[in-house]
Amino acid sequence: MRHFDSMEILNELLKFQSITPDDDGAFNYISMILNDFEEINIDKNGVKNVIFRKTFGPGVHICFAGHIDVVKPGIGWDSDPFDPLQKDGFIYARGAQDMKSAVASMICAVSGVQNFNGTISLLLTSDEEGDAVFGTREALKFLQSRGELPDFAVVGEPTCETVFGDTIKVGRRGSINGILRINGIQGHVAYPNKCVNPVHILASKFANFAGHDFDNGNDFFEPSKLVVVDIRGGMQVCNVTPSDVSVMFNVRNSNLTDANDIKNFINDLYKDCDFDLNLKVSSNPFLTDKNSKIVQKLSQSVQKISGVCPVFTTGGGTSDARYFAEFNVDVAEFGVINDRLHAVNERVSVNEVQKLTEIYKDLIENF
């Protein structure tokens, strides 16, 4: 079997215009490289999920996970976003950081394994950047139905902040979206005593609403803060008071706060008002024990290869790692520096990709 270098793999992956949920042929290319792995295809509603798996012995099952889909490139690039450009030690293309660099490193690392006391798998989806409804979670549901869930997982999201090796994600905040609608009575602005102005009602308590911290955070999570993202009401005229006003907000919550806490807070704050509240939990927070084998072994490999002692954090947005946690699989995340995610002229350091490959290899060898 021919050996594929991680940079060669990355260069080819970046050419695929795999905008969610279209893989654009990327999975066929990966299948060609991992042709001695068992291949399991789990496709649903236009989303492709593929598991490449190989059993070497009776021991633990470690899964490397990621996504091959990317967001649209937009305009303003200095080069073709799907024709990778190597310049001054960087590769420029859409998906370079998020996250084809990690996928390439994972493919290279697992393809070269000769001996391992257990099972190694690679779980890839074409729907992480979109709704992610039929992506990684569907693949894990399938594995659960067969009693084949992995014991540990590494997700290759770009986790590093300023120096390669500085950050391992051991958890993520949850995300709860809400819409609060204050109801009033519409009327003529000249007769405020005959109206019930919902804007005034909202404003009277708004200082206690916007920016509210539901908890004080802990060693791994920042406080769960209510962030207002939009306010709408009225008819865009100056002589009619509105019948209602709506506030859209989001709470990135720690494991100390849930939807009931948010509901109870708003119910109490606006208890004397006529209002409607809609909350939607889009993801739950999770935290992997820092003493878990996957966290400790990954940390050792990162420090060994990069020379940097990583910190364990939970910051940033949501990721597919939450689905592994949902299925009680210990999971940690590690990848390249994340300074150009979804940006024009997205790029990744060649040196980082090479080191990332070595880290994944070292993790397998010493697990």
From Swiss-Prot:
Please state the Enzyme Commission number of this protein: 3.5.1.18
Entry-linked PANTHER family: ACETYLORNITHINE DEACETYLASE (PTHR43808), N-ACETYL-L-CITRULLINE DEACETYLASE (PTHR43808:SF31)
* Gene3D superfamilies to which the protein is assigned, alphabetical: 1.10.150.900, 3.30.70.360, Zn peptidases
Question: What's the protein here called?
Answer: Succinyl-diaminopimelate desuccinylase
Its Gene Ontology molecular function terms?
A: acetylornithine deacetylase activity; metal ion binding; succinyl-diaminopimelate desuccinylase activity
Catalytic reaction annotation: N-succinyl-(2S,6S)-2,6-diaminopimelate + H2O = (2S,6S)-2,6-diaminopimelate + succinate
Gene coding for it: dapE
One matching Pfam family, short form?
A: Peptidase_M20
Functional note:
Catalyzes the hydrolysis of N-succinyl-L,L-diaminopimelic acid (SDAP), forming succinate and LL-2,6-diaminopimelate (DAP), an intermediate involved in the bacterial biosynthesis of lysine and meso-diaminopimelic acid, an essential component of bacterial cell walls.
Source organism superkingdom: Bacteria
Signal peptide segment: none
Q: Name one GO biological process term.
A: diaminopimelate biosynthetic process
Q: Which family does it belong to?
A: Belongs to the peptidase M20A family. DapE subfamily.
Q: Which residues bind Zn(2+) 2?
A: 98, 129, 342
What top-level class of enzyme does the UniProt entry assign? hydrolase
Whether Metal-binding counts among this entry's keywords is: yes
Give the keywords, sorted. Answer: Amino-acid biosynthesis, Cobalt, Diaminopimelate biosynthesis, Hydrolase, Lysine biosynthesis, Metal-binding, Zinc
According to its UniProt record, which cofactors does this protein need? Zn(2+); Co(2+)
Q: What CDD domains does UniProt report for this protein, alphabetically?
A: M20_DapE_proteobac
Q: State which pathway it belongs to.
A: Amino-acid biosynthesis; L-lysine biosynthesis via DAP pathway; LL-2,6-diaminopimelate from (S)-tetrahydrodipicolinate (succinylase route): step 3/3
Positions annotated as active site in the UniProt record: 69, 128
